[in-house]
A protein has these predicted regions:
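Active-site histidine-anchored catalytic micro-motif
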Residues: 1-126
Length: 126
């Protein structure tokens, strides 16, 4: 089975449940991931922090109904490209084999705006 995100600012991972919650309301493993990425690829908080988006990207976005603020999500693109947008999971006797504690998680790194997201699940084989 393949679980895939259509969005270049999102990722799909397998991870276990952390059980404990951080003070931000995220599970502690999720918060740890946020903290690591914040150090490694800081959230874009000001124009010019990253080379992207350039003028041509902003013009393209405007032609497609996007606002300039929403284009300043380079951190989300970089984070997604490192983690990946899909996972492959073995199906054994009709059950996803994620190990004893594994779960599938969808991560939306784009903090510039809320929007509807799509995840595709495809079962391949028998």
């Amino acid at each position: 089975m393949v679980v895939y995100s259509h969005h270049t600012t999102c990722s799909v991972i397998t991870q276990e449940c952390a059980f404990d919650m951080s003070m931000t309301g995220l599970e502690t493993l999720q918060q740890d991931l946020v903290n690591v990425f914040e150090e490694w690829i800081p959230t874009c908080r000001s124009e010019g922090m990253y080379l992207h988006p350039g003028q041509k990207a902003l013009e393209f976005a405007e032609e497609h109904g996007e606002d300039n603020f929403g284009c300043h999500n380079t951190d989300a693109h970089l984070r997604s490209s490192i983690i990946g947008r899909n996972v492959t999971i073995v199906i054994d006797d009709g059950v996803a084999d994620l190990g004893e504690f594994g779960r599938v998680h969808f991560i939306d790194f784009d903090q510039t705006r809320g929007r509807t997201r799509t995840v595709q699940v495809m079962v391949i084989g028998e």
